[in-house]
Amino acid sequence: MKEIFAERFKSARLMKGFSLQDLANAIDGKLSRQALHRYEKAEVLPDGDTIVLLSKALDVNPDFFFRSTKVELGEIEHRKLSKMPQKTASIIKEKTREYLSRYLELEEILGLVDRFINPLEKFGIVTSYEQVNEAANELRKAWNMGNNAIFNVVELLEDKNIKVVELYVEEDFDGLQTYVNGNIPVIAYNARKANKLDRIRFTLLHELAHLLLIFGDITPKQKETLCYQFAGAVLLPEKTLKAELGEHRNKLSIKELGNIKKQYGISMQAIVMRARDCGIINEHYTKKFFFLINQMNWKVNEPTDYYGVETSNRFEQLLFRALIEGQISMSKAASLNNQTLADFRKEYQLAF
């Protein structure tokens, strides 16, 4: 019991971004840094009143400290995480771990064993654009997507047994991917960018490329470029883009690009890069377009917005299935939903 508490206590502290001294200060010195250190080292188990005190300071429910669901994050390959302050990186990892511990515990309660199958497992080594373009087509075929627009990328990934974690963290973070417990694929993304859903969609599929593809002997920069190209190809297949723009073009209009963005949920800049990759426009015009983008200050805020839906209700559906079927109590449901019982009852009172 002490070991479980110690592990969860440290996770809650890191998730909050606190050092041991920060936590001691947050509880007005009611416990010293040394006393907190003993809890974290599993030397002592605090009493009930102390657990309540710590849970309030760390913004978790008291039973958070005693969840035993195993969540081991695999290697995290992320282009920005390694450059972040250690405190920020720890917050991201622990928030990811915390959400997954609740999700996986809920699946365990319901007896769900949904194994992930990588549709590109036998695709082979990837080193070129032509290969990622082909891989994107293979993925669409395996997942029965046709060549149409993807309505909801988050829901698509969850339906394919990839856990998607919504985080609210610093703006500089886009997303990450890893495997949990060795075989459960996970993609986390920054929901603070929710006002730019096209960027979230692109990030999710960029991270999906890292999950699904095996890359050859190429530089990290080349690998990132191929992941970007894969994301673009999944969102906007070559056949679809050529149907929209034609086989070859000398120029593109902002209106055309805006209409494609609104329909397919991909940024105008990514559409232009995709058009270049597909041979619709040449390199000279691509550079000319991006010069215009910079001149008009459209790099961050494009003149046309994409209004879509990027969410999944799978966790909520499982939660209420377990509750209605009597497999969990109301208080357990509140805990799994990371809420107090009072807040849970208030929010979902019309559901019963």
Q: Which residues does each predicted region cover?
A:
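Active-site hotspot residues in diverse enzymes, especially metal/ion-binding acidic/histidine motifs
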Residues: 1-352
